[in-house]
Structures are given as structure tokens and as C-alpha cells.
């Protein structure tokens, strides 16, 4: 069973990686996500793609999900969202707004269709393992959505209209005086959704409306900088769709209503002491979701309501020291408290962690090196250290870059506490923390026909760990243009997957979760900037 799963994953991982990206941007653009401090995109040895303000405006898209899809990233056209970066699903990609993790993962996927692009300054996509700096969920990379910071006093009214009766209206204003600046934006949007298969019941993407409200206030005297930002995202959708059950793949015609809300608060204080910069960051990211589904099941009308809330609270201190123009050291530490409340997981669940990281950036002209590591300690899964080193060497118009780094992802609440289906429903899915007691109960009542796994293999999960390798070469045509190719591979240990555990005497199938054998994801990608 484990070997079959491994072969399937290898097949998937090599079939979706080849992509070509094009963008109109300056090679001298500054990036921050790969190092937690500003460096030139051209100098960065870590593969990073920047989608700038001008390109976002030229593409004339509505949501963050649309933007990723336009840039060649595979996106699932479903309410649950989800995407793939270098063949790894969104479970392995950390997504942030201004460096703050976005809460709202459902079944590992993160829906970005509720984030409008009107307030987005640029998007930085860092590819490859970044657990050495960002920790959990960053095995496949990091997507950092950077919002607009304000500017000259102005007032704007913007409208957009597109296919599927997609409309958008936005109102924004910048104002400030001397050391104080404020930028506010309100955006309203509507869409009729779309149906990729008219021969089936319902729509692929349901009709929806969205509301985005953002505000950032900043005070700076050149030495001290205070900033407070708030981003609120709401999405409502309603319509007819289909739900696939685990009983012989039966499709159920369903009327669905879904409401989701994100609120991200970020309070920052930064002080410059000559070559030393210290920053205190206090953030809170919350998410709530309500899903109501009405359908007919075996001749009976059924109404199902699923509600959930999530919250990520994270205080952090970031310190950087510029030894000279060629050397910069970054040291940071903090803690994270993650809470998830839903009946599917048996009520409120909590996962706490603390972390610290150290990184050094060395620029020797033709040779640039970034080396560092991060230590994470979890209340339930122990500790993990994730080192990484990256280098870039320039020879004439050619540049060679390479990286090797480790990553990790701890089990999520779904794989530990999920309860789905039941003994009398044809299928039963249980998280690792619950399955042993249920098996013991049904075995004592002689209700289990057979098991395919030993209980000790499915009653506890370990964190996934990985080692990623990256090698690339690029050719600089001129100041604005270059072409390149990157070869990469990620070797993952203790991959967490759902597995067939056994069967009850009434033919109900039992599923659980376990750490399967090692898996490898590898591929090649081409890049073109002009």
C-alpha cells in the first residue's frame, strides 16, 4: 500500500512542474520575504518571483486566486481553494499578508478568492523550502502579499467589469501630514460564477459577493516608526452544486450557502540605532466560516450546518545588524498560538509553539551567500531545527544559484481530530488521536471484519520533514531582461496521508491517517523576464 502511494505521488509530482513565467519588472527590484530584510532581487540567491504593481494593473484581474492562476500556478476552481507550487499543494506553502500568516486553511487548502487585488502593492513568491526562516507550512515556499503603504494625499474611485458578470467598485483615500500617513480602501465585488460542465448539475464556481476593507496608519520620525494595519475580507456565495460522498462515489445535488470572514491585525514598532534595527511585531489573524448545505439523501431532506473559527496570535521580535555594505545578520524570536474551533474536530483545539531564527547575508560582489536556520518547539510534537544555505555566483552575463535546506510540517487538526461519516453511513474517517478508542470499542463488540493497519501505526502522527535541493542558471540579456532554468527536488520523510484502515461487518469502510514512506517531488521550470 505504501509503495503504491509513493509511486502515485512521484507520478503527480513530475507531471505538473514545467511552467514558464513572464513579467515586466526591473531586475533591480527589492525583495524582503527571502531574508526578512531588503535586498536586491538580482542579488538574491533564493529563487524568487515578484509580481509588481504595474503588472497587477496590466493583468486587470479581480482576486489573488486569479493572479496566481494567471502566473501559471495550478489553482483549484472550488470554494475550498487550493493551489500547487512546484507540485506541492497549498498545505506546504505559507501564505501571508505583510508577513502575517493568513488563517483559514480548510482540509489543508487556503482559499484566496476573497482577497481583492485593489490594495495589493506586489506579491513575492519565494520557491523552495523556507522553513529556515518561516517555519511550519513552508516546505514548498512562501507567498507574501504586500499591501499598499500610502503616498501623496489623494482620493480615488475605481470600477472594473469582466466575464461572468464580474463587477468591482473600490473607494480609496490617502492622507497625511508631516510624519503621519494613512491609507484606507473599501472594495465591493460581485460575480455570477461559472460552470465548466453544463451537462452536470449546478456550477463549478458559485455566484458570490465580496467585501474588502483595509486601513494602515503610520507615524515615522526617521528613527522610530509605528504602524497599525487592519485587513478585513468577506465572501458570501450561494448556489447549486454537487457533493461527492464516499459511498460508491455518489453525487448529491446540493444547494449551498457559504460565508467566510478574515480579519488580520498587525501592530509594528521599529527603531533604528545606526547600523542596528530592532522591530517588535504583534499580529493576530482570525477566520470564521459558515457553510449550510441542503440536499436529498436516500429520499430524505437533509440540512447540514458546518461552522468553524480559527485564530493565529503571534508576537515576534526581529533584530538586524548591518556590519557593513556586504554583511547583514538577522536574529528573530517569538511564539505562536493557533486555535481551531469546530464540531468536526470535537470542539476547540489549540497548538502552541515558540521559535527563534538566525540568518546571515554575505555579498562579495560576484558571490552572494545566505545561510541560517530556525528552531521551532511545539507543545505536542517536540522541537525541530531547519537549516538552509543558498549561494549565487555571477560570471559575466551568466548567474549560477544553488540552495539546500530542510523543512517541516506538523500534523494539522484535521489529521488528528477529524470525525466524518459514521458506522451506519457507509464510510468512517477518524483522526489519529481518536481512531484507537473507536477501533477498540467496535472490536469489543465484534463489529470489525478486518484491519489493514496495526493500531500503533495509525494512532500517532509525526511531523513531516524534508530536504530540498535547487540549482539554476540564468543569462542576463540586458538591464531589464533575462532567461533562466531551475532544477529542483524535495525529498519528504513521514509524509502524512489518509489510508484505508479496514472494514466493519456491515461493509462500512474505515479510513485514518498515517506517516507513509518517503516521497520525492522534482521538476524543472523555465523563466523569462523582459
Predicted region positions:
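N-terminal periplasmic accessory domains that precede
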Residues: 61-67, 81-84, 96, 111-116, ...
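N-terminal periplasmic "start-of-domain" segments of outer-membrane beta-barrel proteins
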Residues: 26-56, 90-93
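Extracytoplasmic beta-strand/coil segments of soluble accessory domains associated
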Residues: 48, 65-101, 121
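Surface-exposed extracellular loop regions of Gram-negative outer-membrane beta-barrel proteins
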Residues: 243-245, 346-347, 379-384, 393-468, ...
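Face-selective signature of the C-terminal outer-membrane beta-barrel domain
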Residues: 183, 214, 218-237, 255-381, ...
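Outer membrane beta-barrel strand-and-loop segments of large Gram-negative receptors
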Residues: 214, 304-318, 458-462, 468, ...
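Periplasmic-side early beta-strands and strand-to-turn transitions of outer-membrane beta-barrels
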Residues: 152, 160, 172-258, 494
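Short acidic/polar hinge/loop motifs at secondary-structure boundaries
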Residues: 100-127, 215
Amino acid at each position: 500500500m505504501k509503495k503504491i502511494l509513493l509511486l502515485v505521488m512521484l507520478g503527480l509530482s513530475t507531471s505538473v512542474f514545467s511552467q514558464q513565467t513572464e513579467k515586466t519588472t526591473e531586475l533591480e527590484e527589492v525583495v524582503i520575504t527571502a531574508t526578512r530584510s531588503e535586498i536586491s532581487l538580482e542579488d538574491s540567491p533564493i529563487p524568487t518571483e515578484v509580481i509588481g504593481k504595474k503588472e497587477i494593473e496590466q493583468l486587470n484581474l479581480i482576486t489573488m486566486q486569479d493572479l496566481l492562476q494567471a502566473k501559471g500556478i495550478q489553482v483549484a476552481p472550488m470554494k475550498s481553494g487550493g493551489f500547487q507550487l512546484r507540485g506541492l499543494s497549498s498545505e506546504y506553502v505559507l501564505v501571508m499578508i505583510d508577513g502575517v500568516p493568513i488563517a483559514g486553511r480548510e482540509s489543508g487548502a487556503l482559499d484566496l478568492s476573497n482577497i481583492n487585488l485593489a490594495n495589493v502593492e506586489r506579491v513575492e513568491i519565494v520557491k523552495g523550502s523556507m522553513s529556515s526562516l518561516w517555519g511550519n507550512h513552508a516546505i514548498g515556499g512562501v507567498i507574501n502579499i504586500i499591501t499598499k503603504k500610502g503616498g501623496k494625499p489623494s482620493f480615488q474611485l475605481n470600477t472594473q467589469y469582466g466575464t461572468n458578470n464580474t463587477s468591482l467598485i473600490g473607494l480609496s483615500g490617502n492622507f497625511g501630514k508631516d510624519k503621519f500617513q494613512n491609507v484606507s480602501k473599501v472594495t465591493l465585488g460581485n460575480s455570477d460564477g461559472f460552470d465548466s460542465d453544463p451537462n452536470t448539475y449546478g456550477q463549478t464556481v458559485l455566484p458570490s459577493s465580496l467585501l474588502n476593507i483595509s486601513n494602515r496608519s503610520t507615524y515615522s520620525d526617521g528613527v522610530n516608526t509605528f504602524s497599525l494595519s487592519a485587513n478585513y475580507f468577506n465572501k458570501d456565495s450561494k448556489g447549486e452544486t454537487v457533493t461527492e460522498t464516499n459511498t460508491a462515489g455518489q453525487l448529491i445535488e446540493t444547494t449551498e450557502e457559504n460565508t467566510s470572514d478574515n480579519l488580520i491585525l498587525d501592530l509594528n514598532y521599529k527603531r533604528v540605532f545606526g547600523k542596528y534595527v530592532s522591530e517588535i511585531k504583534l499580529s493576530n489573524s482570525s477566520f470564521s466560516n459558515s457553510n449550510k448545505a441542503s440536499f436529498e439523501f436516500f429520499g430524505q431532506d437533509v440540512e447540514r450546518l458546518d461552522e468553524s473559527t480559527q485564530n493565529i496570535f503571534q508576537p515576534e521580535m526581529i533584530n538586524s545588524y548591518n556590519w557593513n555594505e556586504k554583511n547583514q545578520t538577522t536574529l528573530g524570536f517569538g511564539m505562536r498560538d493557533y486555535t481551531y474551533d469546530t464540531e468536526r474536530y470535537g470542539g476547540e483545539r489549540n497548538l502552541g509553539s515558540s521559535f527563534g531564527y538566525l540568518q546571515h547575508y554575505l555579498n562579495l560582489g560576484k558571490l552572494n551567500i545566505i545561510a541560517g536556520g530556525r528552531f521551532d518547539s511545539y507543545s505536542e510534537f517536540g522541537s525541530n531545527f531547519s537549516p538552509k544555505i543558498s549561494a549565487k555566483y555571477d560570471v559575466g552575463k551568466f548567474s549560477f544559484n544553488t540552495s539546500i535546506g530542510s523543512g517541516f510540517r506538523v500534523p494539522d487538526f484535521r489529521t488528528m481530530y477529524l470525525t466524518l461519516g459514521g458506522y451506519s453511513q457507509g464510510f468512517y474517517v477518524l483522526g489519529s488521536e481518536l481512531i484507537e478508542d473507536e477501533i477498540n470499542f467496535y472490536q469489543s463488540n465484534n463489529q470489525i471484519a478486518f484491519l489493514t493497519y496495526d493500531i500503533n501505526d495509525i494512532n500517532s502522527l509525526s511531523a513531516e520533514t524534508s530536504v530540498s535541493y535547487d540549482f539554476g542558471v540564468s543569462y542576463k540579456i540586458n538591464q531589464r531582461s533575462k532567461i533562466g532554468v531551475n532544477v529542483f527536488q524535495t525529498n519528504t520523510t513521514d509524509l502524512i496521508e489518509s489510508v484505508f484502515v479496514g472494514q466493519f461487518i456491515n461493509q462500512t469502510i474505515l479510513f485514518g491517517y498515517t506517516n507513509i514512506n518517503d516521497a520525492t517531488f522534482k521538476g524543472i521550470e523555465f523563466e523569462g523576464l523582459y
